Amino acid sequence: MIYGIGTDIIHIPRIEQLINKYSTKFINRILGKNEITIYQSLSIKQQTNFVAKRFAGKESVAKAIGTGITSSLLLPDIEILNNNLGKPIVYIPNAAKILLNNKKLTEYKIDISLSDDHPLAIAFTVISAST
């Protein structure tokens, strides 16, 4: 059964402006520790697209959970990493797992798709669950 869906689209130049203006402070508000390590290994152009897709992805995950970004579910808490084939995998904090468990979801799967085509990045998330 589909528990929730979420989508988000972002204007990449907006992210670029925020990175240029706030630098590390902005990155730390968006990315988790593992994502920051990946971010630092990328070229400047790749960094901007990486952050834009992660921002859209995290927003779409929060929408699919049904809470949006809250004090108990912050952007850096959600990490989107890639497996060895490049597929994005969502890692959520215990607070989000508790949220889903409180909604009587014993088993769930989070699928996410990320894409960018300058000047836009988009993410789509589906949470499927068995009750």
Swiss-Prot record:
Protein's UniProt keywords contain Lipid biosynthesis: yes
Reaction equations catalysed: apo-[ACP] + CoA = holo-[ACP] + adenosine 3',5'-bisphosphate + H(+)
GO molecular function terms listed in the Swiss-Prot or TrEMBL record: holo-[acyl-carrier-protein] synthase activity; magnesium ion binding
EC numbers, comma separated: 2.7.8.7
GO biological-process terms attached to the record: fatty acid biosynthetic process
Predominant subcellular localization, coarse grouping: cytoplasm
Residues bound to Mg(2+): D8, E59
InterPro entries: 4-PPantetheinyl_Trfase_dom (IPR008278), 4-PPantetheinyl_Trfase_dom_sf (IPR037143), ACPS (IPR002582), Ppantetheine-prot_Trfase_dom (IPR004568)
Keyword Cytoplasm found: yes
Cellular component terms (Gene Ontology): cytoplasm
This protein's UniProt keywords: Cytoplasm, Fatty acid biosynthesis, Fatty acid metabolism, Lipid biosynthesis, Lipid metabolism, Magnesium, Metal-binding, Transferase
Cofactor: Mg(2+)
Subcellular location: Cytoplasm
SUPFAM superfamilies: 4'-phosphopantetheinyl transferase (SSF56214)
General function of this protein: Transfers the 4'-phosphopantetheine moiety from coenzyme A to a Ser of acyl-carrier-protein.
HAMAP family noted in UniProt: AcpS
Family statement: Belongs to the P-Pant transferase superfamily. AcpS family.
Protein name per Swiss-Prot or TrEMBL: Holo-[acyl-carrier-protein] synthase
